[in-house]
């Protein structure tokens, strides 16, 4: 919120947003519609809720990594492939990772990759 951003002297580029499953969906729907671009989006096992709506409302271009398990039965792996296609058509360069033999969860490797992605975009 605005109070915390002012208290900690944060600008949008100091912020990373992310989520798992529905949290990822909300992050994707809101993250690229922000007028003040956040640094990055880290998404696990989500999908774009409405590509048509989102394509008409693109405002910013944060760094994005999306990860998904190939055995996910809650949010099928096709969701990642559709998101990758959407972002490609809209001239985004995103990173993706598909985890083999992984259902609807965040594997340890996913946590590590998310952290590496964050460090890379903050030069840590």
Go through each PLM region and give its residues.
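Short, small-residue-biased leader/transition segments that mark boundaries at the very start
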Residues: 2-3
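Gly/Ala-rich beta-loop-alpha elbow adjacent to hydrolase catalytic centers
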Residues: 18-23, 27
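Short beta-strand/loop motif that positions the catalytic acidic residue
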Residues: 65-68, 72
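Active-site signature of alpha/beta-hydrolase-fold catalytic machinery across serine-
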Residues: 29-33
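Flexible "cap/lid" loop of the alpha/beta hydrolase fold
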Residues: 46-64
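A conserved short beta-strand
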Residues: 36-49
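C-terminal catalytic histidine-bearing segment of alpha/beta-hydrolase fold enzymes
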Residues: 81-124
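Alpha/beta-hydrolase fold nucleophile elbow
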Residues: 9-19
């Amino acid at each position: 919120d605005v109070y915390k951003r002012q208290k900690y002297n944060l600008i949008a580029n100091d912020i990373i947003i992310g989520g798992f499953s529905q949290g990822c969906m909300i992050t994707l729907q809101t993250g690229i519609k922000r007028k003040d671009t956040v640094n990055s989006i880290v998404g696990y096992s989500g999908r774009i809720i409405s590509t048509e709506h989102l394509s008409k409302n693109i405002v910013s271009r944060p760094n994005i990594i999306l990860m998904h398990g190939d055995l996910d039965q809650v949010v099928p792996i096709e969701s990642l492939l559709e998101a990758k296609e959407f972002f490609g058509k809209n001239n985004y360069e995103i990173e993706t990772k598909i985890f083999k033999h992984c259902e609807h969860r965040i594997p340890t490797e996913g946590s590590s990759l998310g952290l590496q992605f964050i460090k890379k975009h903050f030069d840590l």
